[in-house]
């Protein structure tokens, strides 16, 4: 438990800072652009991380939203209940996960449709010989063809959105103080460490996507959708009274409760 507490202390001192929340979006944009320049001008040699079957991609990135929801759900529930003691406020804050799920579903469906309507089936990866008889990506692949369309980077979108959402929700730790004897101490500490490491994985794999995969425009659009999903909620809608609200993070609990009143 001591090692876990040290990790939690380190993460509180890094990811929970307001400067991190303020600068992380710009850092992700800069990393995406820099990685894309490297990919275009001086491609890195093939490595384990450039293989789509690597462990982080298969077991984490492809399940990124599931991982994020599974860890944020108990974290939001425990920390917000610890601070407010009101089930109604906890449920209201948990609705952020429903909003995030809707954003994830709508964006991924949109990306899939864009790739479908802008794509064609080819005989080879070199885009030779259009196979007009195959009108969908699934049918094209089933018949051994290669589908090529405008493939907005789903990884760039989702990893951006998940990382920013976690950092926003962890801001509540400015107010959460539990000593070792508190019945929620172990659970919250464990969740802080898990969410912290998950955030580092998302940022690292975002960098790998920038360096190894997709064209610049595909990554720009993917990152842009992730930023819009984050800013449209935490930067705009959640500031309104009719919304899930922001995590409690004001100087006094009274002010925090007033913030969540309808």
Curated annotation (Swiss-Prot):
Enumerate the catalysed reactions.
an acyl-CoA + H2O = an acyl-4'-phosphopantetheine + adenosine 3',5'-bisphosphate + 2 H(+); (9Z)-octadecenoyl-CoA + H2O = S-(9Z-octadecenoyl)-4'-phosphopantetheine + adenosine 3',5'-bisphosphate + 2 H(+); (5Z,8Z,11Z,14Z)-eicosatetraenoyl-CoA + H2O = S-(5Z,8Z,11Z,14Z-eicosatetraenoyl)-4'-phosphopantetheine + adenosine 3',5'-bisphosphate + 2 H(+); hexadecanoyl-CoA + H2O = S-hexadecanoyl-4'-phosphopantetheine + adenosine 3',5'-bisphosphate + 2 H(+)
| Entry annotation: catalytic residues | 155, 214
Q: Note the InterPro entries from the entry.
A: FIT, FITM1/2
Tell me which domain of life the UniProt entry assigns to the organism this sequence originates from: Eukaryota
What GO CC annotations are associated with the protein?
Answer: endoplasmic reticulum membrane; mitochondrion
| EC numbers for this chain | 3.6.1.-
Instruction: Please give the residue ranges for the topological domain Cytoplasmic.
Output: 1-23, 79-93, 167-190, 240-262
Ranges facing Lumenal side: 45-57, 115-145, 212-218
Topological category with respect to the lipid bilayer: Multi-pass membrane protein
GO annotation terms (biological process): cytoskeleton organization; fat cell differentiation; fatty-acyl-CoA catabolic process; intracellular triglyceride homeostasis; lipid droplet formation; lipid droplet organization; lipid homeostasis; regulation of cell morphogenesis
Decide whether keyword Lipid metabolism is in the record. Answer: yes
Pfam families with a match to the protein in the record: FIT
Q: What does this protein do?
A: Fatty acyl-coenzyme A (CoA) diphosphatase that hydrolyzes fatty acyl-CoA to yield acyl-4'-phosphopantetheine and adenosine 3',5'-bisphosphate. Preferentially hydrolyzes unsaturated long-chain acyl-CoA substrates such as oleoyl-CoA/(9Z)-octadecenoyl-CoA and arachidonoyl-CoA/(5Z,8Z,11Z,14Z)-eicosatetraenoyl-CoA in the endoplasmic reticulum (ER) lumen. This catalytic activity is required for maintaining ER structure and for lipid droplets (LDs) biogenesis, which are lipid storage organelles involved in maintaining lipid and energy homeostasis.
Give the record's family classification: Belongs to the FIT family.
Identification of the protein by name? Acyl-coenzyme A diphosphatase FITM2
Traced from the root, the source organism's taxonomic lineage reads: Eukaryota, Metazoa, Chordata, Craniata, Vertebrata
Q: Which gene encodes it?
A: Fitm2
